[in-house]
Structures are given as structure tokens and as C-alpha cells.
Regions:
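Hot-dog-fold acyl-thioester-processing enzymes
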Residues: 2-95, 158-166
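HotDog/MaoC-like acyl-thioester-processing domains
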Residues: 1-20, 102-111, 115-166
Length: 166
């Protein structure tokens, strides 16, 4: 007799699994490096000296002479840290961002920790089998300071018929 093994595929949450008010903590964090900053900044053609020119940045007031991490890299990493837990294989579309802010700088060597709060969800009026989920992504550094925040609307699949509940 052959024993059937249970297989579990890593995925994000189906629409029905999101709970408004729940905070999802995404671990591990990600330490931001100089290599990350230079690569992302040059790939995106952002020539801002605050990201690339160490000598120039050293003469600028306000950041202790250090170069800043590119804020778009910070935002991308913040969202990326949430993917495995929330949207891997279940998202249909990223509908947009609002209320994006970077209240404190991120510097080389800082570690970004992400958390996401589901702030709203509703069934799609035009796309049966899908729903709109509003997520607030919050990034904190290794000291617990909020360094990034963004509200994002996503279109998420509902649980397929016949799919087992966890």
C-alpha cells in the first residue's frame, strides 16, 4: 500500500483569509548595503549624489556625512518583504499606492523590518472571484523607528473552488 503524502505549496493569502485590522509581521528583515544602493540607483538612472557620491555626501549637513539609501529601493524592499506571506501566487494586480512617506532616512547598514496591516477589503464589483484588499505597509529600522510607510490597494484572488482551508 502506497502512503499518500500531504503537500503544501507556499503561497500568499486568498481574499477570504485577510482579516481587517490584523498586522502581519514579515521576518526576517533585510540589511541594506552599499552594493544594494549603488546597483538599484544606477539601474534606475537616478543620479542623485546623496545616493552615489560619498565625497559630496560627506560635506552635506543632516545625515552625518553618509549616503542615503534610495527611497524607491526602500519602498521596493518593504513591499518585497511582504510577498511570501501575503501575495505570492494570489495577487492579480497591484492597483496603486497612496500615502507614501519616508519619515526617517535609511543608511547603509540599517536593517529594514516590515509589517503590513490589512485596513480594508471588499469584493470586486466587476471581477467575480476576486476582491480588493487595502494594505498599509510599515517599515522600521533596527531601532524600531518608522522609516517608510505606504498604503497599497491590491486585487486578490478568492479561494478556488475545491481548495482546502488551512
Amino acid at each position: 500500500m502506497t502512503e499518500q503524502r500531504k503537500e503544501v505549496v507556499q503561497r500568499g493569502l486568498w481574499f477570504e483569509e485577510y482579516e481587517v485590522g490584523t498586522a502581519y509581521l514579515h521576518r526576517p528583515g533585510r540589511t541594506m548595503t552599499e552594493a544594494d544602493n549603488v546597483l538599484f540607483t544606477t539601474l534606475t538612472m537616478n543620479t542623485q549624489a546623496l545616493h552615489l557620491d560619498a565625497a559630496w555626501a560627506a560635506e552635506q549637513p543632516g545625515f552625518g556625512g553618509e549616503r542615503l539609501m534610495n527611497s524607491m529601493h526602500t519602498l521596493s524592499t518593504l513591499v518585497g518583504l511582504s510577498v511570501a506571506q501575503l501575495t505570492q501566487g494570489t495577487i492579480v494586480a497591484n492597483l496603486g499606492f497612496s500615502e507614501v512617506s519616508f519619515p526617517k532616512p535609511v543608511l547603509h547598514g540599517d536593517t529594514l523590518y516590515a509589517e503590513t496591516v490589512c485596513t480594508d477589503k471588499r469584493e470586486s464589483k466587476s471581477r467575480p472571484g476576486e476582491g480588493i484588499v487595502t494594505l498599509e505597509h510599515i517599515g522600521r529600522n533596527q531601532h524600531g523607528d518608522i522609516v517608510a510607510r505606504a498604503v497599497r490597494k491590491t486585487l486578490v484572488r478568492k479561494r478556488p473552488a475545491g481548495e482546502e482551508t488551512a
